[in-house]
Every structure is written in structure tokens, then in C-alpha cells.
Amino acid sequence: MKKIIFALFIIVLVFQPVSGFSQSFAKIYNSPTDFFNGICDSSQGISVERRTRGQIIMNGGNDFKISSEDKVLSKKLKKQVWGVVCNDSLFINGRPLKLGGSWYGYTEIIGKRLFLLAGIPLDKDFQDQMAIASMMGGPLVAGIAGADLALVRYYYEVYLPYGSISILKKEKMAELLATAPDLAQSYALEEEPEKIPVLKRYLLELKKR
């Protein structure tokens, strides 16, 4: 009975209405170096779709699916493209960076710095650095831990022009806020300084400066 209820719950999640859908002109970047140098391809009819919680639990991956009516371009967008700018928003593909699996994460641009919101790293050395194994509690239990991990998000700083990455920790955030003493003082008082909503709030405040 419990298995049936769980299965029905998953079906409901997967078939939630999709939000955040758009279809428009986009700039397509094949590498971080191309983005840094302003070299891009352009295309009409690019779709940006916010994936549902159920889709992420069932299939993993990041928060945004980007595709095209052109099947060849859609395949390239999924597996090869580094980033897409659509409606002045930058989305970076997690697949080439081995972050969160497939699909794209929304990226804040602050000056010349990029902050990507994406899933857990798939690179084992990176996982070890972030102590992700401890979050799993050993082997995954009946897929539940795996589902929880599929929803975990981190902010990563993506360094241009070559695209190396590092996780945004409280020490790095404090360093970023050094140019805004009022924000730095407020951030120092946060009880959970590495929670995503907290980091996002300060990134957005810094972006306004």
C-alpha cells in the first residue's frame, strides 16, 4: 500500500503544470572563452522551461530545460553548448561542468563575475571536498536519499575566461561583500550564511550596487 501511495505521489509531482516557459531569440555560447569574448551563435525559437520538482526528483538534473524546434540544435543544446543568454538572462549548462547532471542553471552576473545555481557536482574529488558523501549517509536508502540530493542546490562561481569553478562559501561571500560594508556587517550576523536563500539575497543586493 505504501508503495502505491508513493508511486501516485511521484506521478502527481511529475505531471505538475510547467512554469517559466518562454520561446524567443537567444545567444548561444559554445565555451566560457566565447562568452568572455562575446562570440556567439544566435537562434530564434529557443524554449526555456522551468523543470518541475517531480521531473528533477525522477530524472535529476538542473532547473531549466533549454531546447529548440530544430532537433539537431536541441541535441547540441543538451550535450555540448556551454551557455545560453535569453531575455538578458544567462543559463549555464551543468553537463559540461559535471554539475547536477543535465540541463541548465540560472546564473547571476555581477560585474565580470558569474554565480551559477546548480545541483551537486558529479566529479568524485569535488564531492569529497564538499563532504557530499556524508549527506548520503552511506549507500542510498531506497532511492530516497538520491531524491533528496537531486533537489540540493549550490552556488558556484564560474571563473572566466576558462570556466573553472568553485563553490560559493561564506568566506568567499564575505570577501565579495567587502566593497559594501553595510552588507558585510549584516551578512556576518546571519545564522545560516551558506543557505541558498541567504546567499541569493546578498548576491542580488550586491548586484544593485
Tell where the protein language model's regions lie, with residue ranges.
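Bacterial Sec-dependent N-terminal signal peptides
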Residues: 1-26
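Generic hydrophobic/packing signal
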Residues: 22-27, 201, 205
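Aromatic-patch recognition
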Residues: 24-183
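C-terminal partner/receptor-binding element of secreted or periplasmic proteins
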Residues: 174-209
